[in-house]
Amino acid sequence: MSMNNIPQSTTLSDTTAGTSCFDANHIDVTTIEDLEQVGSDKWTRYPGCIGAFIAEMDYGLAPCVAEAIEEATERGALGYIPDPWKKEVARSCAAWQRRYGWEVDPTCIRPVPDVLEAFEVFLREIVRAGNSIVVPTPAYMPFLSVPRLYGVEVLEIPMLCAGAGESSGRNDEWLFDFDAIEQAFANGCHAFVLCNPHNPIGKVLTREEMLRLSDLAAKYDVRIFSDEIHAPFVYQGHTHVPFASINRQTAMQAFTSTSASKSFNIPGTKCAQVILTNPDDLELWMRNAEWSEHQTATIGAIATTAAYDGGAAWFEGVMAYIERNIALVNEQMRTRFAKVRYVEPQGTYIAWLDFSPLGIGDPANYFFKKANVALTDGRECGEVGRGCVRMNFAMPYPLLEECFDRMAVALEADGLL
């Protein structure tokens, strides 16, 4: 291999690890027009609308990531992903997992274009056509649609909202319906989707909840697909615990996938990771998932390694900004939008808003037409999503204020607030 193709991540991390370079003031003055000029789907699909549907942030790139991408393009490192970069991704991902107290063997980590590709391998190779999978709802939309492409039946099991009433409640909490889950397992379902932190409700599971799930899985020989892409986005009072890290039983049950794409806003670079703590899964992966690795982008491996190695300080700046935003969301839902059902997220940068108490059957369409706000239709997240929307609040703070203003004006005009 030539010198130009040897990973340069160590040098990059040495120069960037100690500086944040996250400029909140710059984010605050970013306009809709500025974001449309960037050209993302989030801000160009519906011109003039506030984009609050696609789950990506509007905070630019960490300097270490931008520098790594620039250097890679200058030296023409845009070919198929070579083994040295696969190993760098594994090494840096394993190092990042230590944030959660998880010591992972890098040889268990393989590159994949995105978490959904990992999910597809799980469906194809482990669940297999003719079987079923439990998906707690509301759910990330593809978890409901993709299994059917592989002949796998989706069993929607609605989450329970403990303490939910007609208005927001700071003590409300989302819970798994373990009785319904066990019934599904007893009836022959052998797979479960665990999204933690959960998209779209923002729940962060406790160790005790995951142990209860694991014990049920052990009783009925169930495998767990663990999507942990939102792991860094956890608010004060809550802790992300990787499912596979708890004990040997969970490690053998888990098929974990994660990525730097949410934390560092690089989903378009196409590099996620699958963490295979069950040796049989690793053997299966090496035998049957070669083309999934082959589709992983070299530029994504470079960006991911730079992010994991050198982006921690920048990400802390991002989290401080998002915590300011979630404080605004919580305040708005307690005051102007008190009639809307809402449970404060424990993690992620996504809020789940239930407008059914206001008699709005299709709030996504309502706010798109009456407020120029683009939200995700809750029905895409499962049967329980009727009357609900998913809101991405990882945008400039002033635009988030404007988003709520637009929505409130529309509702007030119709006498609904």
Describe the predicted segments one by one.
Residues 4-13, 248-323, 331-332, 409-411:
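Conserved core segment of the aminotransferase class I/II
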